[in-house]
Amino acid sequence: MADPLIPSPTNKAFFIIDLSGQKSNPIIPTEFIWNHFNGKIQSTNMKLTSDASDRNWDVKLDGARFAGGWKDFSVSHSVRDDDLLSFRHDGGMVFHVSPFGRSFSQIQLISSSTSDDDDDERTVFDDDEDDDVGDDDDNSISEDDFCSKKISSKKRARKETESSSDKSYLVAHVTPSSLLRDNMCVLSKFARSNGLDRRECEIDLRDEHEKSWTLLLRHNKKTGQAFMRGGWRSFCRNNGIKAGSICRFKLVQSGIKPVLQLCPNASSIPEGNSSKARKKRNVSEIEGDEIESENCSETIPLNQNKILTFDLKPYVFRSCQFFLPASFARENGIVEAGEVTVLNKDGIEWKSHLVNIKGRDQFYNRGCQDFFVANGVKNVGDPFTLEVIRGGPSPILKICSKVKQAASSDGHKTADRKPRMTDQAPLAEEQTDNRVEKRAQVTEEGGPSRSTRADPGNLQQKQPCSISDHVKKVKQSIVDTLTDVRRFQSELKVKEQNLEASLQEIDALGMI
């Protein structure tokens, strides 16, 4: 018969659950039940706590298996099926859950107290150490014994956050799920200490080079958890921050629009990749340079979010409205309605108005028909480019009706939607010019040209079956096919916009 469990701050038993490969809710290990519950759990309810949330989570038990309430807890904490979780027994049926895995949306902070007792600290564990945890066969060892194997991790975590005990500092763990969902959860203590636990507003993330990204501060309606969304992925990408990194922010401005400043700290760089990420940030200072992706041989131009190529959609002339992609507007600081100026290559200006769609992070340009027509964009499917000359309030956009002209006049490379057609057209023109020049040279030298050798009578007899008639028919067939393709693309684009709008409405309801 096992001794009864006596909770103490220095020796608390816990068990570890590896969620990878499990298709059902987790189960409390049998060995833990025998050692600490005399072989049988009498209660049908348990309480879960975590450092990521201030509330207690009620979870029902079906024998030893987690039942009702576990799904709400896992969704709120962004738990995935490849995570490794520690359940510390705090007495009775209360368990404190800590992440050893990859998907918790907040990092666990070291306590602001300077106590020498390591057991009072909330430790940060690295993703690359998860495999070592999973190989531990003893599921009911003391937390002290387990954490003694992580001394180096504790020291590293203490270094990362020893200066973050100030209430104005926020430490965040960049996880794959946070990048995938494009949001970052805000630690409840930080939000409450700085008056952000009940607010919904815009919030700026500022990097070391004073460049800002505007995100939206929102709250989960079920749990009250604060999070920032819409721009987190872009911020990490532009600053060379990868999944598994630790970022530290300082609240440098509160008020209507708070500002979080990224602290210059090596903790924002994954271990082993610090030099590579540092090079990326240095390269990003040079406009037009390219960042080489770590896991891909392709290069991504830094100015890719300044210029976009569009095809004119049927709804534009019908509604006199043109929708700007949400990511394009957000990444260029277009976050509020107001006046917008559109320029063409000749410097002619058109004043228009940006309207925000209520409840969404999307804008449309009202009264855009005039500058489209004036710049030769008149038919459905006509390509044109928009370049952001100045973002933020009262933005200035430059329109060009031809992709080729935009690339040559501004010095920016623009993606061509029909590379084969645009590449072959100049070649065909050159070949035609060469043939014309050769014929002209032969005629000037006195030699017989093809037209002088031909009999006009024979040409008139063959006219009904001339090549020009076939060319016209082929050309018309190509035009008809191209029109059908463009119409189909337009319909797909409308459906895509509807689906994006639906996703944004779901996000607005707090279903993250």
From Swiss-Prot:
Transmembrane segments: none annotated. It holds the Pfam family B3. It is found in: Nucleus. Residues 410-421, 432-442 have a biased composition (Basic and acidic residues). Residues 111-145, 408-465 are annotated as: Disordered. InterPro entries: B3_DNA-bd (IPR003340), DNA-bd_pseudobarrel_sf (IPR015300), REM_fam (IPR039218). GO terms for molecular function: DNA binding. Residues 115-145 have a biased composition (Acidic residues). PROSITE patterns: B3 (PS50863). The keyword Repeat applies. GO terms for cellular component: nucleus. The keyword Repeat applies. SUPFAM superfamilies: DNA-binding pseudobarrel domain. Keywords: DNA-binding, Nucleus, Repeat, Transcription, Transcription regulation. Residues 11-103, 169-265, 307-403 bind DNA. This is Putative B3 domain-containing protein REM4. The gene is REM4.
